[in-house]
């Protein structure tokens, strides 16, 4: 079995009201294409922030659905462009239903705060706006979803993340254990 995968996301944000923090007019888009063949899925994605400010959203809320918004990096800095490649492996065809693996790599470049609103402005030690900022992130994940019993659909993930960036950004390494248990409320 072969299936094509694709998606497109677009957001536009504008300020309203008294504009006490200055003006804000921004848009960002992302797109991905991929192919699924048997147990394997390969995807590539592109993303671009066309605005002069970070594309703002409620942090830690999963309220932004952009293809390159991944574990740590959102690749949403002013004028930033980014790409991603992702590979998923479903172990069910190999006799282990519920087990899957994922790895992805994303890279961003050209982040430029030269025209950013003062609220979003990021500067170097000399007070100059940051320009030509770059970063990358790599995620590796193993996931298991319980197949039967009272814990059916409960999932356990172990994900290792590494991100590196130019000056004034974070270089991080972390491991997360993510446990999800779906509840039906109604």
Identify the residue ranges that each predicted region occupies.
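Membrane-embedded beta-strand positions of outer-membrane beta-barrel proteins
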Residues: 6-8, 33, 42-44, 87, ...
